[in-house]
Structure formats: C-alpha cells, structure tokens
C-alpha cells in the first residue's frame, strides 16, 4: 500500500500509520514523499522514524502549482504502474493528495482518504485545499475522519469511519518539549508556537505569559547564538515557561504542534503548515513579504487578501492571541478542553485491513486489546 504525503503535516499524519502497519504485519506500507518540495517531506518522514520508500521529484519549478501537479501526475502514474499497490492512502487536501487520488482512480486502485479538515460550505476556503478535498471525495473508496460529530470508532456512514487524529500520537524528541506535550495532553498546560524573528510577536508573547499562568511558549526560527541580538528575546529565553527551538527541528516542531493552542508568524508557509496541523494560527503583516523559504501547495494561486493578517504591533498581536486562547471553537479553549485520544494510527490500520478483506468489522472492538479503542 502506498502512503503518499506532499507536505510535512501530511507526513506527520501518515508516519504513525506506516509504523502501525509494520508492527501488525498484515499491510505492507510504502511511504512516498512528494509535493512541491519532496525533500522537505522526505526529511520529515526520516525525522519521524519512517524513512520514505520512494521520493518523487517533480523536476519542475516548485512555485508553479499547475506544473508541479502535471509533473506529479506523470511520476505517480509510473509509480503505480511499477508497484501495483492494493490501495493508496492520502491525507489532507494538498495538490499531491489530489493528483495521487486521481492517478490511483485511473489505475482502478482504491483510494483511502485521511480527512483532517472540517466540513465547510465555501469552496474557496481554505484555498485550494477545500476544492481539492471535494475532488478527492468523489474518488475515495474509504473515508477516515480525524474528527467529527460521530464517536471514535463508530462507522459514520457507508465506508466512512471516524478514527481520531494520528498526529496526536506524535511526541517531541527533546525531553523538555516532550514533558510539555505530556502536560498539555493532561490539561495542566497550554502551548503556543511563536516566530522568534518578529518583535511584535515576541512582545505580545511576553505579555501573554504574565497573564496566563498555564501557558508555555515555544520560540521557533532563531538559533541560541542569535538571542543576544534581540533584547525582547533575551528576556523571554530566560523565562522558565519559554522553550527555544533552533531553526526547524522537524520532530520537535511537529510534535509540539500536535498539542499547541495557537501559533503566530509572519511567514505564509509557516502559517499554513500550522493550520494543516490543526493549530489556530495568526499571520502578522510584518512588511517583510511573508513568503517564507518553502512554498506550500497552491501558494502561487492564492489571493493573499483572503488571509486575515494582523497589524504588526504588539497590541494587535496580543489581542489576536488572547482571542484564540479564549475561544474553544478555535481549538485552544481552557486547559484540557482539546481532546486527545491514543490509538488513531491503529484504527486506521484496522479500517484499511477491513477494506482489503483482512478484518470482519470496519472498527476494532474491545475484545482485541492491541487494536481496540481506548
């Protein structure tokens, strides 16, 4: 079975599934790194302990989504013709997921979709993911929902199962962040991810720490040698509830994103990566362009006026952060309000095994402790 990811959040959701499949030994997973920047996805799979079996290089400019999609279609076609998989598993609504689903359909290979978004009525929100998801839905044989109105492990409809978010089982590698993730899951702490290169974000974070005793901040994007160049950063890094994450340590960043209440950045790529991880995010209009180092799927097609940017002053950023922390519908809410459930990856494996005729029921039951719902 091919597990195809086109972004780091997609890799983070599929890596635990690959591990569960290998552990149970009845479905042979082959992880595939694709998308506009496949090496970034490749590195994410490796950092998460699941080295990709295949890395698909588009061979075209990664800033043109249409050309990337066309190149991926040819390469995925060759891959499926060579591998002849029993099924293809995709996550989210990126361009790689869209093309993988279409090519699998052309090859008459069942598509399994791990759907991590909310059901919305606006085709253009988020863009282009929502449109991509609707196309994928028409080609999908088995829907696996990370969240929904149904109860975990209950079949929500024909070939539709709520399994939980596989990202929630991911833990940071660093001991301090791993401890923070554990406390966040227990409801005794909340975490926020801040771009350490934006002074208004740092100032707002400093104020928020003083008024929110259960909040801890993870600063991303600056090395320890850069700290002394920014007085606000100097003060924050000495705070007992502040953690400095140098550059982009993938395992730590995705692991802490799995439990974070909000994120704030001035980079479009980090903004959308946070949103794809289910983290409510704030995009600050710092005037630096905000493009970031890595394009996300569809960036060249996006009307940037659609993104609700926050003014680059500490007061506006603080107001936006406080709003997310106090809004349960945004996913932050009071400590302990965000649900975390173990075993999602094994529920995905079980559902796939059922689709392939290896299980009688689509969801595990309490008689099988290795695969049962908690």
List each model region and its residues.
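A short, histidine- and acid-enriched strand-loop-helix "catalytic/donor-clamping" loop
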Residues: 112-127
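An aromatic- and histidine-rich active-site surface loop
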Residues: 89-107
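Catalytic binding pocket for nucleotide-activated donors in carbohydrate/polymer assembly enzymes
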Residues: 272, 276-327
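Donor-nucleotide binding loops and adjacent catalytic segments primarily
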Residues: 42-45, 176, 181-262
């Amino acid at each position: 079975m091919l597990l195809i990811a086109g972004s780091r959040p997609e890799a983070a959701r599929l890596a635990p599934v690959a591990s569960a499949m290998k552990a149970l030994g009845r479905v042979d997973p082959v992880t595939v790194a694709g998308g506009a920047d496949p090496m970034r996805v490749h590195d994410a799979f490796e950092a998460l302990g699941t080295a990709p079996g295949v890395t698909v290089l588009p061979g075209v400019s990664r800033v043109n989504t249409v050309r990337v999609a066309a190149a991926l279609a040819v390469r995925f076609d060759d891959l499926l013709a060579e591998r002849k998989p029993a099924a293809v598993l995709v996550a989210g609504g990126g361009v790689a997921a869209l093309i993988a689903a279409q090519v699998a359909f052309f090859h008459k290979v069942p598509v399994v979709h791990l759907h991590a978004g909310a059901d919305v009525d606006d085709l253009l929100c988020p863009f282009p993911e929502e449109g991509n998801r609707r196309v994928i839905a028409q080609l999908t044989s088995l829907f696996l929902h990370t969240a929904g109105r149904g109860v975990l492990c209950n079949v929500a409809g024909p070939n539709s199962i709520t399994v939980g978010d596989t990202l929630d089982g991911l833990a940071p590698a660093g001991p301090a962040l791993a401890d923070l993730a554990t406390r966040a899951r227990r409801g005794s702490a909340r975490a926020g991810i801040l771009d350490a290169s934006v002074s208004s974000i740092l100032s707002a974070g400093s104020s928020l720490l003083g008024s929110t005793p259960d909040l801890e901040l993870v600063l991303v994007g600056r090395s320890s040698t850069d700290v002394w160049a920014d007085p606000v950063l100097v003060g924050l890094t000495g705070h007992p509830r502040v953690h400095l994450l140098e550059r982009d340590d993938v395992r730590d960043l995705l692991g802490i994103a799995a439990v974070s209440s909000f994120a704030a950045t001035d980079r479009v790529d980090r903004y959308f990566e946070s949103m794809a991880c289910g983290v409510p995010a704030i995009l600050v209009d710092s005037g630096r362009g905000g493009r970031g180092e890595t394009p996300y799927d569809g960036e060249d097609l996006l009307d940037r006026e659609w993104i609700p940017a926050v003014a680059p002053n500490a007061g506006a950023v603080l107001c936006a952060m406080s709003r997310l922390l106090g809004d349960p519908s945004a996913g932050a809410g009071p400590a302990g309000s965000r649900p975390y459930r173990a075993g999602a990856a094994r529920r995905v494996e079980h559902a796939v095994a059922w689709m392939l005729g290896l299980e009688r029921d689509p969801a595990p039951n309490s008689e099988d402790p290795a695969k049962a719902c908690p």
